Regions:
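Flexible, acidic/Gly-rich N-terminal and inter-domain linker regions that tether
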Residues: 1-76
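Alpha-helix N-cap and loop-to-helix initiation/capping positions
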Residues: 191-199
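Conserved Radical SAM active-site core
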Residues: 42-176, 185
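Internal, well-ordered alpha-helical scaffold/interface segments
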Residues: 138, 168, 198-205, 214
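Generic secondary-structure signature for well-ordered alpha-helical cores
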Residues: 26-29, 33, 43, 91, ...
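Cell-envelope and extracellular/periplasmic
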Residues: 182
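Conserved strand-turn element in the central/C-terminal portion of the radical SAM core barrel
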Residues: 186-192, 204-224
Length: 224
């Protein structure tokens, strides 16, 4: 299975042997063969390649409230899966073993992942979580329609650090989103997360009722 994004939609060539990844606002400028700060993408001959397409780092059947979503099919369970990599580097990350490095995960196709989610006992669908799901953009793009076609629900649990146009590309295939706001402080985001609050807030503007159910979770780690 090829991991290469042949369409080149996630990056652009900006000068000789260097490409800029456009998937998130970090806009990593990568030399040939260099990986981004997310550990999930690299420059392959001037285009941005996904290193984690078809690799599952973790999966489980979780209560929907664990996402946490409290107004979306309360009391139900949802099959949850995630790949490797994250575009933030939160010092308090609970899933740092999969978010801060790329290892070899279980190989699955989008069809296989959709089947796992739909066949899990009492699962209402598939939640992309554990690491940052937007780093798994192509896998979500190819898997979510298969889940929805069988009547399943699709959920994202995200840090909100994704370029708005790529989030908009996923929204038609998503039923609910939880954006985890780490703190309402630019200084906190820069010091503890390696990101910017402004990037997140760009993605939590009201959708005017046209998008999926949104939930926003503010998390402030103790002592920081």
């Amino acid at each position: 299975m090829s991991n290469i994004n042949h369409a080149g939609k996630l990056g652009k060539e900006c000068y000789t042997a260097t490409a800029t990844c456009l998937l998130c606002p970090q806009h990593c400028q990568l030399r040939q063969g260099q990986s981004g700060r997310c550990h999930a993408r690299k420059n392959y001959e001037g285009e941005i390649e996904s290193l984690t397409y078809g690799e599952v780092a973790a999966w489980n059947l979780d209560p929907i409230e664990k996402k946490p979503l409290y107004h979306f099919y309360p009391g139900s369970s949802i099959f949850s899966a995630g790949g490797f990599g994250c575009n933030l580097s939160c010092s308090f990350c609970q899933n740092h073993e999969i978010s801060q490095k790329h290892q070899v995960g279980r190989k699955v196709t989008p069809a296989e992942l959709a089947e796992m989610a739909l066949e899990a006992q009492k699962s209402i669908g598939l939640c992309f979580t554990y690491s940052e799901p937007s780093m798994w953009f192509e896998m979500i793009r190819d898997t979510a329609p298969l889940v929805r076609a069988q009547g399943g629900k699709v959920v994202l649990v995200s840090n909100g650090t994704i370029s708005p146009r790529f989030l908009e590309a996923l929204i038609p295939w998503v039923d609910a989103v939880n954006i985890d706001i780490k703190a309402f402080s630019e200084a906190f985001y820069q010091h503890y997360c390696g990101g910017k609050l402004a990037w997140v807030l760009d993605n939590v503007e009201p959708s005017g009722g046209q998008g999926p159910l949104g939930d926003y979770n503010a998390y402030h780690p103790r002592g920081q």
